[in-house]
Amino acid sequence: MKSFLAAIALFISFSTSAQYYYQDIVGTKETSAIMKAYRDNKVNRVVLNSYDENNTRSNDFYVEQQFSAVNQTLKTTTRSDMDHESVLTSYLDGNNNVIKTTDSSNIVTTVTNYTYNADGMLVSITSFSSDSAKRTTESEQHLWQYNNNKIARMLRIKNATDTTYIDFKLDGAGNVIEEQETRKGVKSPSIYYYYDNNNRLTDIVRYNNKAKRLLPEYMFEYSPANLVIQKITVPSNNDNYLIWRYQYNGQGLKTKEVIYNKQKELTGKIEYQYSFGL
């Protein structure tokens, strides 16, 4: 079970790394799509049951989601053990856009607000984080800029004083293919995005210091219904990648995640249990 929890922890920490287009634009749309699927299928509760590499049920990692179609909210409660619990609540507007999230744990609470332009394009993400004792507060803004309704630049502003500029390059189809951040005049290595013939994101690539070459950090495969059926995550500081394989039911709701390590050995799995009702 330790290896399974380590895999989950690695994925969570890896998901917070700086791929701004993927995290802000793609990730926010994924949350909206999940909530829309729950609403369309009258889902009101989801329980994620975890199993280790020996197919033994574990209560060390527990996730429960509660969806309210009336309030347009999705509350996700995650417990990694008896002492560590976090609650993430996401809110939608009438256009199915995520407009707010609150993420709270025993240590930190983060409130994030999202705004959109008249065309439904994300223009700002503003987050405020404070510790449980209210002794420290941090803020971060992501201000998205567009040129002819296509992504051009994003400003990341921390605590209203520290600004990083993230510039984007697009292909002929309008897909983001490169992002590069500049802070205090110093440019960071670029992140590259690759797509298939259907304009679906297939790879996110950056320079790997250990390998001394460009390597993918994410790789995606899709079903004919455009659902992600496999995701490979590769940490930037090593090559111990994880393979996540997904299964869905006929309504497009995720039913199972199976996780393998680099050696193709089963690390664990997660099964989804749905409850339905208005």
Region spans (language model):
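N-terminal signal peptide c-region/cleavage motif recognized by signal peptidases
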Residues: 13-15
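Buried hydrophobic residues that stabilize the cores of well-folded domains
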Residues: 19-278
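Positively charged n-region of N-terminal signal peptides that target proteins for export
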Residues: 1-5
